[in-house]
Design a protein with these regions (language model features):
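Radical SAM/AdoMet-radical enzyme domain recognition
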Residues: 148-175, 182-302, 307
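C-terminal accessory region of radical SAM enzymes
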Residues: 315-348, 374-423
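Acidic, low-complexity/disordered tracts enriched in E/D and polar residues
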Residues: 1-42, 478
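Long, charge-rich, low-complexity alpha-helical segments
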Residues: 31-109, 149
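Cysteine-cluster motifs in flexible loop/terminal segments that predominantly coordinate metals
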Residues: 407-454
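Short, small/polar residue-rich loop motifs at catalytic or cofactor-binding pockets
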Residues: 16, 359-363
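Short Fe-S-cluster ligation motifs
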Residues: 153-173, 440-481
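Canonical Radical SAM [4Fe-4S] cluster-binding loop centered on the CxxxCxxC motif
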Residues: 102-149
């Protein structure tokens, strides 16, 4: 009989009344009572199930074997001498030859315009880029507004790629600048492709400051099920404006969208510029007032922010306060930082089905500039081609480097407690600071690991699988008389 041992990827977080355990590559978070945890630790030294049955003779052997098999199926136990990382390597070797087919792609980001009618101090575009191509395009008068022709080519090419790879869903994001400045092209895309095109289901979203919203837009968004994400500037939440220098009232914009029946979410940023004024309690209260049930919290994309212990702790505190208060009020507070936890508990598909962990800039999304130039994301600096030659884009070494990150993190990530679920910090931020993506920013890693641990420590027992060994004790027969 093969001997079993605890996986070297086993992660254990002691809690007040139980232990939270998960696999750092595959997740499967569950809770063990004290007896179950003690049994698990017997396998720290390789042994067979029969040996354990003898040591735990007070338990029903059938239930005990079932318990051990459950630990084995979730990866907490493994055959002695087997390294589970080989499964990732096998998956990579099987899939890498298909990178150039575009099989990873699930999303298309259309940069409708590089203009904006606001001047938010924390906007990443002002300081994000470090490539000559980005510098040229940011100044090019031809790269201001996307034409319907360019948008149409991008959508058609991506639909073709998805169909060839057997994928049937494409997520299209209207982005900017302020995308509503190019409303007519957005409207034309929606009315041309609708929610189904050539057998591919199209899901739409838009990120906007909302200041230009009118009922016609809200009605069109509702018709085509466009998720509307409102960028909320924390500095002006109390005044209920959509952006610092805006004159559009947040309440008015939300009312227009809600009257049309739209799904609305909020986005806000915790950054160097917003840290002092960020008020998660007010943000959640406003969401509650306007019947907005989801808030996306984005952490600063300037890596210099994470060099200070005090700033990291302050950001973590604001993140946790907002998340906790959101739970109290029935508001989901999410972000890339939250996706790590979601994957560990099995509530969100991992890269084996979705193609990425926390960041879609791993070959899973293409961002198209107004003139048709292709980047992996609006945040990234590396130029990878033009939408009219998508085959060249997908065969470029630049695209392959991003796609590799869907499987492998930087060498420094090996052995990390969230290795299988974190893509590291924003690829664009790494390019800006280090001019490469195969590296880490330790300050950001600290925040991701701490918030993940805190989320696990505070998960409620009814929200996750519990494996109680104490209930498996052999029942004794009591004879009266």
């Amino acid at each position: 009989m093969n001997k079993l041992r605890t996986s070297k990827y086993l992660q254990v977080i002691p809690r007040e009344k139980d232990y939270a355990i998960y696999h750092s590559l595959f997740g499967n978070l569950c809770l063990l009572d004290f007896d179950g945890y003690n049994l698990l630790r017997v396998f720290d030294k390789a042994c067979s199930s029969n040996e354990v049955l003898k040591s735990f003779s007070k338990y029903d052997p059938i239930l005990l074997i079932h318990f051990i098999n459950t630990l084995l199926s979730k990866g907490f136990l493994t055959i002695d001498g087997f390294d589970e990382y080989v499964l990732i390597e096998e998956d990579y070797q099987r899939c890498k030859k298909h990178f150039h087919s575009g099989y990873l792609i699930r999303a298309l980001q259309l940069v409708m315009t590089n203009k904006c009618n606001r001047s938010c101090e924390y906007c990443f575009v002002k300081t994000m880029y470090n490539s000559d191509e980005r510098a040229i395009l940011e100044q090019s008068p031809k790269n201001v507004n996307m034409s319907f022709e360019t948008a149409s080519i991008a959508v058609e090419r991506l639909i073709e790629i998805l169909r060839k790879n057997g994928n049937r869903e494409l997520y299209i994001e209207f982005f900017g600048g302020e995308p509503l400045l190019n409303w007519q092209v957005i409207k034309s895309v929606l009315e041309t492709f609708k929610n189904q095109a050539n057998g591919v289901t199209l899901h739409y979203s838009i990120t906007t400051n909302g200041s230009l919203m009118i009922p016609e837009m809200a009605d069109i968004f509702k018709k085509y099920n466009v998720t509307v994400t409102m960028s909320i500037d924390p500095l002006d939440l109390k005044e209920q404006t959509a952006c610092r220098k805006g004159n559009g009232r947040l309440a008015q914009v939300i009312r227009i969208l809600k009257e049309a029946g739209n799904w609305v979410t909020f986005n806000s940023v915790i950054s160097e510029e917003t840290m002092d004024e960020f008020d998660g309690y007010t943000l959640v209260e406003k969401a509650k007032d306007y019947n907005v049930t989801m808030i996306g919290l984005i952490l600063d994309l300037d890596l210099a922010f994470y060099g200070s212990d005090n700033k990291r702790e302050a950001a973590l505190q604001k993140l946790w306060e907002t998340y906790s208060f959101g739970r109290q009020k029935g508001i989901a507070v999410v972000g890339y930082w939250y996706q790590i936890f979601q994957q560990i508990i099995g509530k969100q598909a991992t890269r084996f089905s979705s193609g990425y962990k926390t960041c879609p800039a791993t070959g899973c999304k293409l961002s198209i500039e107004p003139e048709g130039h292709v980047f992996i994301c609006k945040c990234c600096s590396t130029y990878i081609g033009h939408i009219t030659d998508l085959d060249m884009v997908l065969h470029s070494p630049q695209y392959e480097a991003y796609a590799l990150k869907a499987y492998y993190n930087a060498p420094e990530c090996k052995g990390c407690e969230v290795e299988g679920f974190c893509s590291g910090v924003c690829m664009g931020a790494l390019e800006k600071k280090y001019n490469k993506i195969d590296t880490i920013e330790s300050g950001t890693c600290t925040i991701y690991k701490k918030i993940t641990r805190k989320l696990i420590e505070n998960i409620r027992t009814h929200e996750i699988l519990t494996l109680p060994l104490v209930q498996h004790e052999r029942k004794q027969l009591h004879v009266c008389g």
